[in-house]
Amino acid sequence: MATQTAPTTVADRIAALDWTTLKAELDEVGHAQTPPVLRAAECRALAAEFDDGRFRSRVDMRRHRFGEGEYKYFNSPLPALVDEARRALYPPLAEVANGWARRLGQDAPYPADLEAFLERCHAAGQTRPTPLLLRYFAGGHNTLHQDLYGDVAFPLQAVTALNRAGTDFAGGQFVLVEQRPRAQSRAHVIDLERGAFLLFPTRERPVDGTRGAYRTTMRHGVATVTAGERMTLGIIFHDAA
């Protein structure tokens, strides 16, 4: 009897995910976390890139009153693993994005592959890559925000921890806040698992109401790290102006 082998490439691992369940979770609760996709050695290799020169810009969060920590945007070309994950995550998320647009009575504007979407970004003057590494030490945090860099924006994005909560750092939970019209804000506090991708809205998502779907505004941030070093990889699909 033939034996099945585990997917070896990042793209194969992403393709093998239970996308039916993940899409349902995104539709119902607005976020979903995959099982681990990146292996421990891959996470360590990405984290080690933080101190090299492959970045187009560095942001000190305190200086800009974004929180306490540091992040760096990768330069082009992206590291192979980051580029592979970005391209593999995009198609199933584009299906979700188009479904959300239809629920809100809009056209389904997102092409099926990332290259076509990036061409749209570039035509709008958004040519700088946006995947990034983020690092926090004890006391580090990130205030609530949205990752928008121009008129063209993809409705979903992804983040993964590159080290282990409870072992390499404490605190630092991912915080996702939704503001529904004429209602109090609701916070989702999520523990990131190393190598697993949390999928979540960039700016808004549809929620079903008594008169059809309506928009709820989303923002995200990071709770205070109480000990250790927390590192994450963020994958944003639209480029920046």
Tell me what each language-model feature is:
Residues 32, 126-138:
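A short glycine-rich, His/Asp/Glu-containing loop-to-beta-strand
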Residues 135-137, 151-168:
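Short, conserved beta-strand element in jelly-roll/cupin
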Residues 154, 165, 169-241:
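Catalytic core of Fe(II)/2-oxoglutarate
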Residues 142-149:
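Histidine-centered catalytic micro-motifs
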Residues 77-87, 119, 138-141, 154-155, ...:
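Generic detector of contiguous secondary-structure segments
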